[in-house]
């Protein structure tokens, strides 16, 4: 029985973004393992997935601690002897890629779901950090039997050029997919319009611009509600503070809902989806909104623009521009026929490009090819 080991930095993220892939592997007779920090979820036992607890901090930068993570992964790989290691998010694919090289893992999948703050931010410190990270990235992406999955073409072009990754290693898979049965198309609700933001409450998700746009629209005398669906991420330096979030609750047109599992239900009660992020891999919340038939307003940045068809399923606005964001939202508020047209087109896009069955099938094809190459 072939073994596949997933390495991710958050078990809840794995459950929300990769579980269908793992389930398909199990159904096909693979032995599937997950290594991650955080809680072991009940669903893992229910589906027959083996869980390995990692000591991994998403944001820690202590050199000794980071070296220990590589050693920890090396030990896990040598003890478990997986046929494929599939690593998702930055630290797993960086440190796991190095450990997999050391442990001579037969096949490696490195899933780049976004480049992170090191490649978003500017300034001397960030540029210096990139120089330090270059040899680690170079090593992590140098496995002879490896596939690197990107969610958008901007990220793939950047890393291919920066690291001289051979194009034969690269695959483009647009996001983690959406369950079209769970996220069904619905007509817009009647009554006061609702504009919904679904994401962690991080500055680089554009939450401040979303709140600012809500107040611009309120000052224009337009009575609509703005829903904020997501929690603080206090271990993340980009997280909004509790005090700032509390201040938003004073605005009459803003409703802080917090993290929710019933996103499909929330979209069914909404009219417009909005994510003014600074950069993404490919945001799951936007493809879920499309599946539900909601027009989207998002930023013209990598990942976000890949989740929509501009002026067909949604509208693109400049980054960090609350005025432009408010203008786009206001346009959709005032044009229900445009919202309906975009929502219908969004559902069609989700069915064509983002169906979970399509995404899972693309992963299975990658695994089969890697296993075949490992046996040569």
Predicted features by range, described:
Residues 259, 278:
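Aromatic "clamp/platform" in nucleotide-sugar-dependent glycosyltransferases that forms part
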Residues 309-311, 315-322, 331-337:
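Conserved acidic donor-binding segment of nucleotide-sugar-dependent glycosyltransferases
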Residues 295-298, 308:
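Short hydrophobic beta-strand element within catalytic cores of glycosyltransferases
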Residues 41-45, 220, 225-253, 257, ...:
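Short, structured helix-loop element that forms part of the nucleotide-activated donor/catalytic region
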Residues 52, 134-185, 197:
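Donor nucleotide-sugar binding/catalytic pocket of nucleotide-sugar-dependent glycosyltransferases
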Residues 187-205, 210-214, 226-229:
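Conserved donor-binding/catalytic core segment of Leloir-type glycosyltransferases
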Residues 324, 331, 338-353, 359-365:
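A short, well-ordered alpha-helix in the C-terminal region of glycosyltransferases
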Residues 23-25, 71-74, 128-147:
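Membrane-proximal helix-turn-helix segments that form the acceptor-binding/catalytic region
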């Amino acid at each position: 029985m072939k073994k596949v080991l997933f390495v991710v930095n958050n078990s809840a993220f794995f459950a929300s973004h990769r579980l269908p892939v793992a389930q398909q592997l199990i159904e096909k007779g693979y032995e599937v393992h997950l290594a991650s920090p955080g809680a072991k979820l009940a669903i893992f036992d229910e589906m027959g997935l083996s869980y390995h607890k990692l000591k991994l901090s998403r944001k820690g930068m202590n050199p000794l601690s980071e070296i220990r993570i590589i050693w920890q992964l090396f030990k896990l790989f040598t003890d478990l002897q997986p046929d494929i290691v599939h690593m998702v998010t930055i630290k797993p694919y960086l440190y796991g890629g190095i450990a997999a090289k050391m442990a001579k893992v037969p096949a490696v999948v490195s899933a780049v779901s976004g480049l992170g703050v090191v490649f978003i931010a500017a300034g001397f410190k960030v540029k210096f950090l990139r120089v330090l990270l270059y040899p680690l990235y170079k090593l992590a992406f140098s496995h002879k039997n490896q596939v690197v999955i990107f969610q958008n073409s901007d990220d793939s072009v950047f890393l291919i050029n920066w690291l001289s990754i051979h194009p034969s290693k690269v695959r483009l898979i647009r996001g983690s997919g959406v369950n079209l049965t769970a996220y069904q198309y619905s007509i817009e609700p009647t009554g006061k319009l609702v504009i919904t933001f679904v994401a962690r409450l991080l500055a680089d998700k554009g939450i401040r611009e979303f709140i600012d746009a809500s107040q611009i629209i309120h000052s224009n005398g337009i009575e609509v509600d703005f829903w904020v669906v997501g929690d603080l991420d206090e271990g993340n330096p980009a997280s909004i503070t509790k005090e700032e979030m509390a201040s938003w609750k004073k605005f009459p047109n803003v409703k802080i809902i917090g993290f929710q599992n019933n996103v499909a239900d929330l979209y069914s009660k909404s009219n417009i989806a909005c994510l003014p992020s600074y950069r993404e891999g490919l945001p799951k919340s936007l493809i879920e909104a499309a599946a539900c038939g909601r027009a989207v307003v998002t930023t013209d940045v990598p990942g976000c623009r890949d989740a929509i068809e501009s002026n067909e399923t949604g509208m693109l606005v400049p980054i960090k521009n609350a005025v432009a964001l408010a203008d786009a939202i206001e346009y959709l508020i005032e044009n229900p026929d445009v919202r309906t047209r975009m929502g219908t087109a969004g559902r069609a896009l989700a069915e064509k490009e983002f169906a979970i069955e399509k995404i899972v099938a693309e992963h299975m094809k990658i695994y089969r090819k890697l296993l075949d190459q490992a046996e040569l």
